[in-house]
């Protein structure tokens, strides 16, 4: 059983299908009263449920992700990817599709987005990305994701077992051998998840408690951001407030302690800095001597020099190079950073995080621009040479417009004629077939590979793609079905497309586990089993 693609041996899998049968048979021979239990049925059920706990999943996927990180260090073409999934079914279908199209799941991950949990999974209803949703909904979704991925393993193996029984019944030894080899080389649908813990939902202890629950549910990688927990905003909205480094480092250590306590020693901590777009801090950092990390954080504060004579009642005053400085304080009691310091603060954040236990970085940017990211990563790598990023290929960016602007500006700078383009209107469909638009699309197509090579991006993710695909596909179906096309709007654009594209869900009873259940009934009741998959089951219409 290939539960260790790329040579990972942390999670022990059986040597062979026959070996698992032999182990079950040896056990059954010690239990003379277990009548009607067969070794092969036991072996099959064990193979269909190799990951028995979330910690099994976390340990296996952490080792997998560590191997991928090492591979990327040696070859930046080996970057990894994920799509954000807001339900276990979406994750399951993604991995089934990846296996169908590419034959393997290597370097394919899941991303769990706090934004989508807030918008789609909170009992309060749709919420903005401000950490107002129940924090227990995060580990609950992780558990759900892996429940569906494990069921994908069970379903695919069950189909192979049925084919094996058929080959034996027909006496087809060649086919039987092929199917047993397929079982022995089976690659699981279980892949790493990078899970969003926001800003920790409270203090360091609260972060630790939630991290434990997330790891126990199966998370091998926790992504934590340097915003103030109770002022948290989406990374692509205004009003972000960061915390001093000592506050953030305590939360990094809380995540690491949670991993180590639970025996997930390869666990990954992803530290996200929002400093590029955050102009405010809630606290002035504690500094013990000039040049320490607190002093460096405070050096970015927007201050004015004062004297004892013009100090006001209630002023907060800091000593900067022997001068009395008053940080600019807003009516909200927040302090303001100097404009134009975002990149410098990001670089300091990243270096400090990597020197204090972080494994991967996340720099939240306002646009998808390779050189902007690379410029910061170059500075970070002067201090930490193997620094690497997870990067948010965010739907909050207008990708079409951003890349058309980039091409337009490059053409203009190179002295090329741009007179037929209106930069302010480049989103218009009339530009779609122009050389500028085609060049922009090519840059979008190669963005991930190019930035993996140039900007140190190990993992490319889209945070909320399946939020948008759900809306788009539903809009298309509603337009056709409730319009003149009626039932043809569903049949032509959904069911017929599923059949022609080989989408497994066209047999929705099978996908939901009906065949697995039927086979279990046969294991338990033998010939007396009342099964759903008989001649009158309408799923037979789909072959």
Regions found by a protein language model. Name each.
Residues 473-493:
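Long, continuous compositionally biased terminal/linker segments
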Residues 371, 471-472:
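Extracytoplasmic/secreted cell-surface and envelope-processing proteins
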Residues 2-6:
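Terpene synthase/cyclase
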Residues 400, 468-469:
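A SIS-like phosphosugar-recognition module
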Residues 492-543:
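C-terminal functional modules
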Residues 462-467:
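Short acidic/histidine-rich active-site segments
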Residues 7, 11-455, 461, 525-543:
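Alpha/beta enzyme core
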Residues 1, 242, 381, 478-482:
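Short alpha-helix boundary/capping motifs
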């Amino acid at each position: 059983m290939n539960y260790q693609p790329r040579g990972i041996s942390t999670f022990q899998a059986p040597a062979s299908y026959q070996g698992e049968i032999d182990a079950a048979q040896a056990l059954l021979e010690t239990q003379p009263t277990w009548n009607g239990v067969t070794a092969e049925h036991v072996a099959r059920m064990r193979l269909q449920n190799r990951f028995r706990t979330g910690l099994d999943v976390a340990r296996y996927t952490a080792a997998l992700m560590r191997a991928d990180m090492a591979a990327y260090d040696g070859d930046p073409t080996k970057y990894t990817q994920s799509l954000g999934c807001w339900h276990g079914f979406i994750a399951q279908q993604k991995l089934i599709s990846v296996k169908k199209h590419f034959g393997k799941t290597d370097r394919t991950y899941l991303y769990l987005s706090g934004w989508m949990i807030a918008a789609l999974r909170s009992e309060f209803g749709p919420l903005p990305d401000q950490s107002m949703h129940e924090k227990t909904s995060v580990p609950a979704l992780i558990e759900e994701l892996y429940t569906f991925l494990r069921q994908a393993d069970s379903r695919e193996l069950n189909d192979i077992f049925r084919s094996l029984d058929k080959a034996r019944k027909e006496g087809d030894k060649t086919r039987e051998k092929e199917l047993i080899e397929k079982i022995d080389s089976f690659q699981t649908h279980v892949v790493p998840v990078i899970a969003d813990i926001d800003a920790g939902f409270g203090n360091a202890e609260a972060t630790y408690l939630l991290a434990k629950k997330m790891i126990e549910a199966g998370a091998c990688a926790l992504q934590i951001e340097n915003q103030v927990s109770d002022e948290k905003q989406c990374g692509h909205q205004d009003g972000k407030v960061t915390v001093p480094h000592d506050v953030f480092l305590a939360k990094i250590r809380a995540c690491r302690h949670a991993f180590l306590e639970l025996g997930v020693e390869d666990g990954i901590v992803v530290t996200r800095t929002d400093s590029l777009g955050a102009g405010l801090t809630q606290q002035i950092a504690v500094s013990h001597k000039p040049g320490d990390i607190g002093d460096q954080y405070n050096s970015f504060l927007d201050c004015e020099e004062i004297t004892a004579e013009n100090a006001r009642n209630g002023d907060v005053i800091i000593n900067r190079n022997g001068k009395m400085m008053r940080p600019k304080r807003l009516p909200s009691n927040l302090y303001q950073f100097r404009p134009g310091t975002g990149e410098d603060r990001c670089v300091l954040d990243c270096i400090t995080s990597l020197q204090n236990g972080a494994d991967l970085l996340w720099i939240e940017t306002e646009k998808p621009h390779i050189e902007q990211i690379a410029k910061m990563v170059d500075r970070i790598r002067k201090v930490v040479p193997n620094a690497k990023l997870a990067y948010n290929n965010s739907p909050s960016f207008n990708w079409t417009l951003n890349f058309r602007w980039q091409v337009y500006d490059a053409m203009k700078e190179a002295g090329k004629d741009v007179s037929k383009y209106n930069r302010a209107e480049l989103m218009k469909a009339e530009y779609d077939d122009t050389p500028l638009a085609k060049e922009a699309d090519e840059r979008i197509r190669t963005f991930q590979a190019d930035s993996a090579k140039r900007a140190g991006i190990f993992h490319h993710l889209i945070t909320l793609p399946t939020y948008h695909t759900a809306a788009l596909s539903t809009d298309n179906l509603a337009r056709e079905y409730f319009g003149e096309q009626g039932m043809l709007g569903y049949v032509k654009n959904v069911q017929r497309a599923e059949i022609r594209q080989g989408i497994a869900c066209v047999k929705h009873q099978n996908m939901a586990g009906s065949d697995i259940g039927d086979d279990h009934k046969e294991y338990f009741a033998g010939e007396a089993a009342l099964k759903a998959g008989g001649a009158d089951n309408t799923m037979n219409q789909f072959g």
